[in-house]
Amino acid sequence: MRFPRFLAASATLCAVAFAAAQSVPVPNAAPSNSVQIPAAPAPAGASAWLLMDFSNGQILAGANPDARVEPASITKVMTSYVVAAEMKAGKIKRTDQVLISENAWRGGGGGTDGSTSFLPLGSMVSLDELERGMVIQSGNDAAIALAEHIAGSETAFVELMNTYAKKIGMNNTNFANPHGLSDPNHYSTARDLALMGRAMIRDFPEAYAYNKIKEYTVNGIRQHNRNGLLWKDTSVDGIKTGHTSAAGYCLLASAKRGEQRLVSVVLGIQTDSQKQGFDLRENGNLALLNWGFRFYETRTLYTPDKVIASPRVWKGKDNTVALAVATPFSVSLPRGKFDALKANIDLPKHVIAPLAAGQKVGTLKISLDGKVVAEAPLVAKVAVAEASFFGRLWDGFLMWWDNL
């Protein structure tokens, strides 16, 4: 009710604004066994690499994360993402029959130097089979056929790829084709590729599950998944290999152990030995994943149902508004460090109505040893309508007085 607040404010002719920055308790911050953390194992020969926590996108370790690289067939993760998004929108179905055009056959078929699903020219293949061929065997012909089926041409499909990439947050990426063969306008970064892998797992888990299939048979030809980590570690369930002479040997990987999932990417390993290239990209990723699981832990600190602050609302029908995070807010830290966390909230001096439910009002910042390690927007849990004319007028006067 505004009337009691009006009386209290009238008595003092002044209102104390909610603090611009306040400390708040950090839940789920009980200490765990502290361990001495060695440096992350840099993958041998890699020009860029990165390890990311899946739940929050935090980078745990990396080198040259924003250096421009050729993604090679890791590109096909974005092709898969577009396929899944278009399927979710009801524009295509797994049962669709897709024509293998001359463009798909010549650009990615058995007569090319790239990886292929050996799809016969002029044949009709189900969309589901094409997706398997692209994800498991890395078939360039399958990628082109999918692109043509969805958008009518590779060029139009690439526009979709770049549109979705920007939505994911891949700000330093540009795709020029759906398969990843070298092109001057086809590039990405380790950070962007990790974000892409994270988005694929998060947004389309059913489509992502294709990445852990070890082999399949099409046209009488048994084809194996090129991600050798699927055989080396049962916690690994994806995601995509890549290789061209310019890109080197590359691998974007993910593993889940318990409730923790990590995403790793190793790029740009140059060697004339295919076996060595395979081994280096696999062992480099596996070492990063093992290091991350051993020395880091991830905890959810706040959930949307937890009210973190209730600042005063000016010019509103309600005196206060409950603030919370919009989505579960987790933090990844070295083991044993959670008890040292500090949480602060940044709010404007005056929170002014009207406020919509879900509207950002402030920011929650989590710090360790004086350094901000994670932050999230604080949003209004409920809407707050404007007060009456006289209520707004009175609060306007009090805000003026408070600013003197």
Question: Where are the model-predicted features located?
Answer:
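Bacterial N-terminal signal peptides that target proteins for export
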Residues: 1-11
